[in-house]
């Protein structure tokens, strides 16, 4: 029954080469490999061989086939790596077992003691198996499919391992790492290993998750009922295995089979100087011709036959080629001009190459290497070498005329060739009459220099004279000599005068005169003063320079105008050679210039320097013509800057300040209470008053408290003592009244009574400014100097008039005064210049610098940093100039400032960008990208979230941070349809397309890649483009091509590209494989392609390809999130949607969909949803389409879709473990190989028996009949199995769009298809159709609604996957850039082989 299925086909060239290549890898010879491909009709020849030989050959072929299959199978499923676990800590404070008993006790005594237990003897056991959910439950009893191991005793009840390697468990694996796993870790008491594990169990923990091979550890912490265990795990591939499943094998090598190292992903990295798939091709020397050169070692350049040169780019001529070249082709002989023949050795232009005809004879080529000479009159011979008379050779040169001289003997002269014999064979003898023929000999050769006596050498000729006449030459003017060969030198006599140079000419001469003379022989004097008048070049240049210097100086407007006027007036037009002269006087051979004032030199072009010793006091002198100007330094004036400017003349000091004139400046001495450079600032130190009593006065040092008499101290805080003892108790007090006591006086004459009352004395006697004196009449006050009055209560004002000078402030005292002097003055009355500093003159740490009276320099303050002013009392604004960067706020004080930085920056001046990626906030091995005041995480496959904390394989990870049943990840779940999402105002760079929702403790994620980040996105804080931190250090931000903008203007966007060592920009970092990028996608089970035709006139402003792609991702995510989790199975891959303009078009977008996981069940679901989303029927509910396009520009890109074409591969139902599939396939192939072997063996046995006379025809016919019946049934079954690869999406597409999926052939085709199985294979599976080529803008929408559009799904029979074509729909005649596809009847396919590619075309 296997005979039909394994029937051999004629071997094509490609299959034969692949078979031979496989044979080479197994060490088989090409002969053996070729033998297995021979056609079947040659098999009967084997029957004639002995049976033993036939059996051996069949056995050897079968063994080779089985060995090839097994080697390929082993290579397919080979993998290697280690699962590693290290114990970090265990805490068992009670030393209890999990059952509550104590560690280290016999079973019969455990019930007697539960506290104060002995320490445990702790070891750990690891069980590793396939992934199991919590509902399934993880237990060691069900087996450890990935392996198990036990550590040695690590310690007591509680311990922390400083060296985690002590408690390490390593489980090697040789299968494809599944990424997901379940581990069970047990802590056991090793007191008595004979006890069952359940009685020795201290604690047990299990963990189920996903881990990718990496050198990084993942730490896990288990808090159990009895103990706490901290451990860490990781997976590492073996040394020569790579990628996430440890299945990529790469071993570095440097031998004849390859020269490469291994990359981080197992890719082969060629060593320096090698290239190719296996790096076995050497890179030749730079510039080595790739066709004509080769190399076995890097850097060499070995030429192939026929080529030479250091770079093998020089061809070699054919051997023996004489006058030819190879002309860019090896072993060629391309003849040069005038040469012919196979070896280019025949002269085709003998006349031009050799010039054989002498004496002006005309040469004519007659044949290769042949010629004929036509001689002039008087010449003859084969080469015109015979001279019949002397003038025939034109011996007279330079226009001379030859004349023959005859004599009495008129014998002719005969010229022969150089053989030296005449026609008669006699030699030629020299005579005196031959002296005129010397012109015929070569230069330097005498006539008697011939080798034979009596022979006259005439170059190649020899003369034989019998009776020869002579000739004479009549020379032209300027020539002389026997043959007019001598030029007469007319300059020999020196005809040129006054130093002129004589140049000899033919028949004359010419004199080149100096500039001062002219004439034929330079005899006439030139009048230089009569030269045409022209602008004085030197004067103009000087004028320009002078004007520039004047304008750049600090002259006043009046002085500036005068200087410019003087400079212009001093220049004039030139008089001949004199530029700035009064008169030009001609002299023999020369001239003299009478210069104007201020000018000198031969031509008066030099401006005399008038600035020597003129300007004073550091002024800058500007030299004019016969004049100068002084640009004075600051503080001086006058023509020579000799006068010091009195800056105090305008009284700049305010508020009564005294102005002190200085050099170039002034200084204000401010009165009490004022400060500043102009005394413009009032100093108020008495508000509020610091004096407790009395009144406050401002002083340069601060303030002064003028206290009342009974007070003393700086702030009048001290009380003066009172005098209460006699005799000071009365009479000396200003407040004594006459009613202090009562006295009655009685006289004899009257009876009146007088009463005097005296008040009790109080205060100081004599008001404290005098002494109380006693006298006969009573007490009185003797006042101190400066006071007066009965009780010395009046203070004499010594400050009136003011005795203080130079602005000093007078302070009245007790009988004296004090002068508070202004800065720079001192003395009792402030009349002396101060040379020293007084205490406290300079404030805030300033240093006082003494003055110098001889220089009128007063003491001044040198302020400390941060202070300024006359007394260093003014604080400098440290925040002036904005020292804080990046939006920082400056705060300052006296001599200091500090920056309060904005979020994301630090440092003293806020220039340091805070690295939010340190410490690492992203989880699960994600890549952290630092930003301004934040960070972003690029999650690895299988993770999502702001910090990649959501593990897609863990249903509860998205719900761990949620306080209720709905987590924060609900943005996409609340949208009812894709149109709602499109109208929410999302930007093109929205990264929320990949979101998770948490409902009732279970999470679901869209797991959709959101596109590359836009490195030209504007930062809301800095408002600057090219956001800092998006691109890494070795990357650059590459802006998107302008062609991707569908309708300008578009927002600027770009993506980060790696910068290669050659300074070239690498391709974008797309997660999808390059085989599924737009414009180069290969449609297969893991890659689908959609082609979208747009009407550009309906596309809204600002729409771009990436904007359309971002919108499609968001819309797809909104639909995927609604699907139940069971639709996608466990551990789905990441979906990737990529978009780009179709090559060569500007209105067609190619979109590819792929998954990071092979045979991902969500891929066909996503493709079906995209078909629904991009259908025009989805917009039926929009009543005002034009208004919607104006309001939402991004939707306009979708509403402008004219046609959608979808291509996908047929995806088989069901899924299984890839390792199991590989093993089952291997077993099946082995069984098939064994069956082939048995079949061949019995076939030969039957053939042998047939040849021996045995008749097996009935049984063979029956067997053939059964096989043909089985084949027909199989063909019918295959036809019935033909289904839509979009699976569930087809029904939803029909319900949502109202479109009919035509999955069966047309009725008329179906009827004919039932006639034979062959017709089933050749007829197309779709009816002919003819869509309109153009939709009218006004009626197109209605017609589209009325028309019953069809989505045609058909299997392309002749698709070529390598060229990325899909049958007849992608034929060269099809122009996808047009408005519609004209689906005519497709011709039947010519073959029954092809890849399973389905194409869907949607007309909208």
Swiss-Prot record:
Transmembrane ranges, per UniProt, are 1220-1245
According to the record, glycans are attached at 148, 192, 243, 327, 408, 448, 554, 735, 961, 973, 1000, 1026, 1146
Expression across tissues: Restricted exclusively to cells of ectodermal origin.
Instruction: Note the superkingdom of the native organism.
Output: Eukaryota
Q: Where is the composition biased (Basic residues)?
A: 1-10, 32-44
* Xref: Pfam families: DSL, EGF, EGF_DL_JAG, EGF_TEN, hEGF, MNNL
Query: Is Transcription set as a keyword in this record?
Result: no
Q: Where is this region: Disordered?
A: 1-44, 417-436, 1267-1287, 1360-1404
Topological domains, Cytoplasmic: 1246-1404
Look up the signal peptide feature and give its range. Answer: 1-79
> What does the record say about its membrane topology?
Single-pass type I membrane protein
Provide the DSL domain boundaries.
Answer: 235-279
Boundaries of each EGF-like domain copy? 280-313, 311-345, 347-385, 387-485, 487-523, 525-605, 607-642, 644-680, 682-717, 719-793, 795-831, 833-873, 875-911, 913-949
In which compartments does the protein localize?
A: Membrane
The Polar residues compositionally biased stretches are: 11-22
Report the SS bond pairs.
237-246, 250-262, 270-279, 284-295, 288-301, 303-312, 315-326, 321-333, 335-344, 351-363, 357-373, 375-384, 391-402, 396-473, 475-484, 491-502, 496-511, 513-522, 529-584, 578-593, 595-604, 611-621, 615-630, 632-641, 648-659, 653-668, 670-679, 686-696, 691-705, 707-716, 766-781, 783-792, 799-810, 804-819, 821-830, 837-848, 842-861, 863-872, 879-890, 884-899, 901-910, 917-928, 922-937, 939-948
The PTM Phosphoserine maps to 1292
Gene3D superfamilies found in the cross-reference section: 2.10.25.140, 2.60.40.3510, Laminin
Function recorded in the entry: Acts as a ligand for Notch (N) receptor. Essential for proper ectodermal development. Serrate represents an element in a network of interacting molecules operating at the cell surface during the differentiation of certain tissues.
- Further facts: Separation of neuroblasts from the ectoderm into the inner part of embryo is one of the first steps of CNS development in insects, this process is under control of the neurogenic genes.
Protein name (database record): Protein serrate
Q: Which organism is it from?
A: Drosophila melanogaster
Q: Which gene encodes it?
A: Ser
């Amino acid at each position: 029954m296997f005979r039909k299925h394994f029937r051999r086909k004629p071997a094509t060239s490609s299959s034969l080469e692949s078979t031979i290549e496989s044979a080479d890898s197994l060490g088989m010879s090409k002969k053996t490999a070729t033998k297995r491909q021979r056609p079947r009709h040659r098999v009967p020849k084997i029957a004639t061989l002995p049976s033993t030989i036939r059996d051996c050959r069949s056995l050897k072929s079968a063994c080779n086939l089985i060995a090839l299959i097994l080697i390929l199978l082993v290579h397919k499923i080979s993998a290697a790596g280690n699962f590693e676990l290290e114990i970090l800590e265990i805490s068992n404070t009670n030393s209890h077992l999990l059952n509550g008993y104590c560690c280290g006790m016999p079973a019969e005594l455990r019930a007697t003691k539960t506290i104060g237990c002995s320490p445990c003897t702790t070891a750990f056991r690891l069980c590793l198996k396939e992934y199991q959910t919590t509902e399934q439950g993880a237990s060691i009893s069900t087996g450890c499919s990935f392996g198990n191991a036990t550590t040695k005793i690590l310690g007591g009840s509680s311990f922390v391992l400083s060296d985690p390697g002590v408690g390490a468990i390593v489980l090697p694996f040789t299968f494809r790492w599944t990424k997901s796993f379940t581990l069970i870790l047990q802590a056991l008491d090793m007191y008595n290993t004979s006890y069952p594990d359940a009685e020795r169990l201290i604690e047990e923990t299990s963990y189920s998750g996903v881990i990718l091979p990496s050198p990084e550890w993942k730490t896990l912490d288990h808090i159990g009922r009895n103990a706490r265990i901290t451990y860490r795990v990781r997976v590492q591939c073996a040394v020569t295995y790579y990628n996430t499943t440890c299945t990529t094998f790469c071993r570095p090598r440097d031998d004849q089979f390859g020269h490469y190292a291994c990359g981080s992903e197992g890719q082969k990295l060629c060593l320096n100087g090698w290239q190719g798939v296996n790096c076995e091709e050497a890179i030749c020397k730079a510039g080595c011709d790739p066709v004509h050169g080769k190399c076995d070692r890097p850097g060499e350049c070995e030429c192939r036959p026929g080529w030479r040169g250091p770079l093998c780019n020089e061809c070699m001529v054919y051997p023996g080629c004489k006058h030819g070249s190879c002309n860019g082709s090896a072993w060629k002989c391309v003849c040069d001009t005038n040469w012919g023949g196979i070896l280019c050795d025949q002269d085709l232009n003998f006349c031009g190459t050799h010039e054989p005809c002498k004496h002006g004879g005309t040469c004519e080529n007659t044949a290769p290497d042949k010629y004929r000479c036509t001689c002039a009159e008087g010449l003859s011979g084969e080469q015109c070498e015979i001279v019949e008379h002397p003038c025939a050779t034109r011996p007279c040169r330079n226009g001379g005329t030859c004349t023959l001289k005859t004599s009495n003997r008129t014998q002719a002269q005969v010229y022969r060739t150089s053989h030296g014999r005449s026609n008669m064979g006699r030699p030629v003898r020299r005579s005196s009459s031959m002296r005129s023929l010397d012109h015929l000999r070569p230069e330097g050769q005498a006539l008697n220099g011939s080798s034979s006596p009596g022979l006259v050498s005439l170059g190649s000729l020899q003369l034989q004279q019998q009776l020869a006449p002579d000739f004479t030459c009549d020379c032209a003017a300027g020539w002389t000599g026997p043959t007019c060969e001598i030029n007469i030198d007319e300059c020999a006599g020196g005809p040129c005068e006054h130093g002129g140079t004589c140049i000899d000419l033919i028949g004359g001469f010419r004199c080149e005169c100096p500039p001062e003379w002219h004439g034929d022989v330079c005899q006439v004097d030139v009048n230089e003063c009569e030269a045409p008048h022209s602008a004085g070049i030197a004067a103009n240049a000087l004028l320009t320079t002078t004007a520039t210097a004047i304008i750049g100086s600090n002259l006043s407007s009046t002085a500036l105008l005068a200087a410019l006027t003087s400079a212009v007036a001093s220049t004039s037009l030139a008089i001949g050679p004199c530029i700035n002269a009064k008169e030009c006087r001609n002299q023999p051979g020369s001239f003299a210039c009478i210069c104007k004032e201020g000018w000198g030199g031969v031509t008066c072009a030099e401006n005399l320097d008038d600035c020597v010793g003129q300007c004073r006091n550091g002024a800058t002198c500007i030299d004019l013509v016969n004049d100068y100007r002084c640009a004075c330094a600051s503080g001086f004036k006058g023509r020579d800057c000799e006068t010091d400017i009195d800056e105090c003349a305008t009284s700049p000091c305010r508020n009564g300040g005294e102005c002190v004139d200085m050099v170039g400046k002034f200084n204000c001495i401010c009165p009490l209470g004022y400060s500043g450079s102009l005394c413009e600032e009032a100093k108020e130190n008495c508000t509020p008053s610091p004096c407790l009593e009395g009144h406050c006065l401002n002083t340069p040092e601060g303030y002064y408290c003028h206290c009342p008499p009974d007070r003393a101290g700086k702030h009048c805080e001290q009380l003066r003592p009172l005098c209460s003892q006699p005799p000071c108790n009365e009479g000396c007090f200003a407040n004594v009244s006459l009613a202090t006591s009562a006295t009655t006086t009685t006289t004899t004459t009257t009876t009146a009574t007088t009463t005097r009352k005296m008040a009790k004395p109080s205060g100081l006697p004599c008001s404290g400014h005098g002494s109380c004196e006693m006298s006969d009449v009573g007490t009185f006050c003797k006042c101190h100097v400066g006071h007066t009055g009965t009780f010395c209560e009046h203070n004499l004002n010594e400050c009136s008039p003011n005795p203080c000078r130079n602005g000093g402030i007078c302070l009245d005292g007790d009988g004296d005064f004090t002068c508070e002097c202004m800065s720079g003055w001192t003395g009792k009355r402030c009349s002396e210049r101060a040379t020293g500093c007084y205490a406290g003159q300079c404030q805030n740490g300033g240093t006082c610098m003494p003055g110098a009276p001889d220089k009128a320099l007063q003491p001044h303050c040198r302020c400390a940093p941060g202070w300024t002013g006359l007394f260093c009392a003014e604080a400098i604004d440290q925040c002036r100039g904005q020292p804080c960067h990046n939006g920082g706020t400056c705060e300052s004080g006296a001599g200091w400032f500090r920056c309060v930085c904005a979020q994301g920056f630090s440092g003293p001046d806020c220039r340091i960008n805070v690295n939010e990626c340190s410490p690492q906030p992203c989880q699960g091995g994600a890549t952290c990208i630092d930003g301004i005041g934040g960070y972003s995480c690029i999650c690895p496959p299988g993770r999502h979230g702001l910090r990649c904390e959501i593990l897609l394989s863990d249903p509860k990870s998205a719900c761990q941070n949620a306080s209720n049943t709905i987590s924060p990840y609900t943005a996409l779940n609340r949208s009812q349809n894709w149109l709602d999402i499109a109208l929410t105002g999302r930007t093109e760079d929205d990264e929320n397309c990949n979101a998770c929702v948490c409902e009732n403790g279970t999470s679901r994620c869209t797991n959709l890649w959101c596109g590359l980040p836009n490195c030209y996105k504007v930062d809301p804080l800095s408002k600057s483009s090219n956001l800092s931190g998006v691109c890494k250090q070795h990357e650059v931000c590459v802006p998107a091509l302008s062609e991707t903008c569908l309708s300008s203007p578009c927002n600027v966007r770009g993506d980060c590209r790696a910068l290669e060592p050659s300074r070239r920009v690498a391709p974008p970092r797309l997660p999808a494989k390059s085989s599924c990028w737009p414009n180069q996608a290969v449609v297969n089970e893991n890659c689908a392609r959609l082609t979208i035709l747009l009407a550009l006139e309906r596309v809204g402003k600002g729409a771009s390809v990436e904007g359309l792609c971002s919108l499609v991702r968001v819309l797809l995510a909104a639909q995927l999130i609604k699907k139940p989790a069971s639709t996608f199975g466990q551990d789905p891959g990441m979906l990737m949607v990529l978009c780009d303009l179709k090559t060569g078009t500007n209105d067609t977008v190619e979109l590819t969909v792929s998954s990071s996981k092979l045979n991902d069940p969500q891929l066909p679901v996503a493709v079906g949803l995209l078909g629904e989303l991009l259908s025009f029927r989805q917009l039926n509910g929009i009543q005002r389409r034009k208004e919607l396009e104006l309001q939402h520009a991004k939707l306009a890109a979708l509403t402008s879709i004219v046609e959608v074409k979808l291509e996908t591969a047929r995806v088989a139902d069901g899924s299984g473990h890839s390792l199991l599939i590989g093993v089952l396939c291997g077993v099946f192939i082995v069984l098939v190989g064994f069956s082939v072997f048995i079949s061949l063996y019995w076939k030969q046995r039957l053939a042998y028996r047939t040849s021996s006379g045995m008749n097996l025809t009935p049984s063979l016919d029956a067997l053939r009949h059964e096989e043909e019946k089985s084949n027909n049934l199989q063909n019918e079954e295959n036809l019935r199995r033909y289904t839509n690869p979009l699976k569930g999406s087809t029904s939803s597409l029909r319900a949502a769009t109202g479109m009919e999926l035509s999955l069966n052939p047309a009725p008329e085709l179906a009827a004919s298809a039932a006639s034979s199985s062959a017709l089933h294979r050749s007829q197309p599976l779709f009816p002919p159709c003819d869509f309109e080529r153009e939709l009218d803008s006004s009626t197109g929408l209605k017609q589209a609604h009325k028309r019953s559009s069809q989505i045609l799904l058909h299997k392309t029979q002749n698709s070529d996957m390598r060229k990325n074509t899909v049958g007849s729909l992608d034929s060269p005649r099809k122009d996808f850039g047009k408005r519609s596809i004209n689906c005519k009847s497709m011709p039947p396919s010519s073959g029954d082989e092809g890849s399973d590619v389905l194409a869907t075309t949607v007309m909208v």
